[in-house]
Amino acid sequence: MKKYCKLFMLMLLVFSYSYAGIMPETEWAKRKLKGKVKSMVKTEYGYENSGKIKFTSLVKTEFNENGYVARESFTRDEVEYKIVQYQFDKNGFIAKRIEEVPQKSLNNYKYSYKYSKDGNLVEKSELLERAKGYYPMYDIITYNKLGKEINELKYVEGKLEGDVSTFYNERGDAIEVKNNRNPDYPYILIYYDYHKNGGYEKTVDGHGRRSFVLIDKNGFQKELAYILFFGSKNPVVQLDTYVKNVNEKRDKYGNITEFTSISYDVLENNKANAEDIYKQLKEQKIKKIGISGKVEITYEYYD
């Protein structure tokens, strides 16, 4: 009997160690950052068609040595409007998240973790208190063995308000985001055209909108197009946004430090479907509107 008991305990120990290394994907990986970034300050300038500055936004992000965000602050036109701070436990998991909107609200979230029967990491974030009243609210996120989010449940006052699953291809890129509360309706579908040089084109369908994104081999977004659909039968198709990001600069680690966004429109914006509009974009049958934005990013590194 003791022999079987020891064997059972050994199996439990092996099972435990098999999944103990699973962690959520780091922000360094999500943002495709190179090197051990300690902090980054991203300043964005938005322009009107006349060339006049429309807004200035600044996001300062501080990372811990494991690549997770420790603190992030958001400023627009010199007014800080949101601060998010994270506290971590001894195993490196998030233990607490504090969201502060200066002069308005302070939200505290507590985190807990466990492993599912199939060995996936399950994270629960629960709202503990709110400056303007309290109501029970929590999210449950499940991560696969690679640390990528595969399911998110949202509960408000004990009632399930959201159930969304994400599916990936063999490269680890998301290909579908599914609303499990309405499984017959495709929530978001994502298609890829991978290039031999390491870049790719991504098409995203969902929410009455199709987007086309061109990414280069370094992970930099070169082009972005949003096409809107109005109406369910014979929908009206309209190009909402087409932007090219140019003049990118990088630091010695290979991280982007600067780029300029230029807006365009197609010459014939009255086509019957999204493919015709996108064909015009690919054939460069477009007209330049002007500079719509400029981004500057500075970094501090651990090493």
Language-model-derived ranges and their functions:
Residues A20-D303:
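Buried hydrophobic residues that stabilize the cores of well-folded domains
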Residues M11-Y19:
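Hydrophobic h-region of N-terminal signal peptides that target proteins for export
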Residues K3-L10:
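Sec-dependent signal peptide recognition
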